[in-house]
Each structure stands twice: as structure tokens, then as C-alpha cells.
Amino acid sequence: MPQVLMGNTRLHAPLEDGIPLIENDENSSQNEVDLYDYVSMSSYGGDNDFLISSAGGNITPENRPSFSAHVVLFAISALVIKPVCCFIFLNHYVITGSYDFAVAGGVCTVLYYMRLALTAWFMFRNIQSDMLPLNVWQQFVIGCMALGRTVAFMVVSYTTLFIRSELFFSMLAPNAGREYITPIIAHKLMPLISVRSAVCLVIISTAVYAADAICDTIGFTLPRMWMCILMRSSSVKRS
């Protein structure tokens, strides 16, 4: 009589009345072990493991991980642009005693580095727990930090540049080009700097820092908002 193995039982072919006979067979456990060994060993194809290796996969160069320009721009922004702008703001504070840009730039920069550290900590904990790098509330907190620092710096910059207008008066003064001051770090090649040049550097640094902050905020929030819109629209279509 033909037999079929199912678990620890042996299923006989149906009889004439259509009712199969099932009998226990303790010796069938050895057959199960042999079957498991066969399945495990069949996953290996010579030197390639088809279950855990992508050696046999045909991945095009466009889909392979690459060192993108975004990484370079991020390094320039975090390690060059922000420190240089803060240095110019500090130099302006030492020269004029006006601390608006120095405080705003310093606080926003410290908040930026805190946001990077918090993001890295969130990602480390989540990946360690086998979860997505950032969940919803973590993305909300990081997005609020990015948006808050940008708005704060923009408000301080607008108030200082266009409402008080002290910088423009200092730059357009008749003697501004002939008055020289000592920069915060004096050098043999540049022992003195004119007031007009110092004010121009502050205005340029303010514009660069504001543009960098806006791009940083857009780069974090816009892709996530767009993905949320796409997911919601796809769920509405399915329903």
C-alpha cells in the first residue's frame, strides 16, 4: 500500500470508502532529520550560499551603493561652512560688541550638532533592535529641531539686518573704508581689516548660513513629507 509521510505519522492511501488510515510511526523521526539535512545542504551551491549570499545576483552599477555628492556637501556644511560663519560672527562681536549674530549662530550650530548626535543615537538603538532607523515620533522631533533652528536664525537675521540697519550704516559710512581694526586672529598677511570689509563678511556669512540652514531643513523634511503623501494616496486608492 503506498504511504505518505506527514510529521510523526504515516498516511496510507485511501481505502475504497475514501477514509485514510493513519498510524503512528516513531521511526519516521529519523526520516525527518534526513529531510532537514537535505534541505539545509541543498542551499549550498558549491562555493556560493544561495540563501545568504548575493554573489549570484546580477546588480547593475546604477543600483549599487555609491559615494554620492550629498555626502561631500554634508561634510562641507558641517565641518567648513558652519564653523567659518560662526568665527566671522564672533569676530564681529569682538569688533563691535554686537552679540546678535554670535549668539544666534552659536546656538543654532550647537543645536545642529546635537541633532546629528541625537539622530545617530536613535538610529543605533533602532537598528540594534531590528527596527527602522527612525520611527515617526523620532522623525518629528528631529524635524522640529531642524525647522526651529532655521526659523530662529532667520528671525534674528531679518531683525538685525533690515529693522535695525546698523550694519548697513556702518558699511556705507564715509570713513568705513579708511577705518581699520584688528581681527580676532591677527596674521602677518592680514594684521588689520577695515570696518567695511568686516561688515561685508558678516552680511555674506549671514546669507550663506541662512541658505545652508534652509537647505538642511528642506533636505530632511521634504522627502519624508513627500513619501507620507505618496503612502496615504496609495492607501486611499486601495480602499
UniProtKB/Swiss-Prot annotation:
GO biological process: viral life cycle
Cellular localization per UniProt: Virion; Host cell membrane; Host endosome membrane; Host Golgi apparatus membrane
Keywords noted in UniProt: Host cell membrane, Host endosome, Host Golgi apparatus, Host membrane, Host nucleus, Membrane, Transmembrane, Transmembrane helix, Virion
Domain of life where this protein originates: Viruses
Similarity field: Belongs to the alphaherpesvirinae UL20 family.
Function per UniProt: Plays an essential role in egress of virus particles from the nucleus, cytoplasmic envelopment and virus-induced cell fusion. Forms a functional protein complex with gK and this interaction is absolutely essential for their coordinate intracellular transport, gK glycosylation, expression on host cell surface, and function. Together, they modulate gB-mediated virus-induced cell fusion and virion egress and therefore actively participate in these processes.
Name under which the protein is recorded: Protein UL20 homolog
Organism: Equine herpesvirus 1 (strain V592) (EHV-1)
Lineage, uppermost ranks: Viruses, Duplodnaviria, Heunggongvirae, Peploviricota, Herviviricetes
